[in-house]
Amino acid sequence: MRISVRQLTEADWRIFSEIRLKALLSDPAAFGSNYALESKFSEAEWRRRLRGDDSAVFMIFDDETPIGITGVAVDRDDPAKKTAFLWGSWLEPEFRRRGLSNLLYKTRIDWAKNHPGIERIVVSHRASNAASKHANQKHGFVFTRTHEKTWTDGATEDEVCYELKLKS
């Protein structure tokens, strides 16, 4: 097993779409989006999601085989552009519980630290997602709040929010 992570580019749109859709199908409760919506995306939309300086999508590989995906972006809701948010993490089930999420967290946190102006990172998950809770806390994220949310699968459940301050 040779594990590597790399940032995707527009040229990677096809593998991005395949792994993202696979993730949405296999673990729909883990995401703020859904397969029905994203399966209708055009090539142009997949490419757009991989373009730009204010976001990054990373794929984790076992040798040359993609086994997971994750993303980070500057938060559009922060007019000062000082906040990044983590989104869309997923690993193939047989690669879970091997510490690989540590590599995904480190990659995204490093991206945010190296992105000019970012002072904090936010992340959230469903209250029932114990694995995300553990991973967020393990990487220094501090609980900030919960609020009720209706998720894209129609379920209503609390969203648990955290932040990691990068600069004081």
Task: For the regions a language model picked out, list residue spans one by one.
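Terminal substrate-recognition subdomain of acyl/acetyltransferases
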Residues: R2, L8, K138, T152-S168
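Conserved SAM-binding loop
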Residues: V5, H125
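Residue-level detector of beta-propeller blades
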Residues: Q7, P66, F143-R145
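Acetyl-CoA-dependent GNAT
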Residues: E10, E18, A23-E94, Y105-T107, ...
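Amphipathic alpha-helical recognition patches that constitute DNA-binding helices
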Residues: I15, F85-L86, R120, A131
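Conserved active-site alpha-helix within GNAT-family acetyltransferase domains
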Residues: R98, N102, A127-R145
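Conserved GNAT acetyl-CoA-binding A-motif
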Residues: A112-S124
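Conserved catalytic-core motifs of GNAT/GCN5-like acyltransferases
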Residues: V122-S124, V142-E159
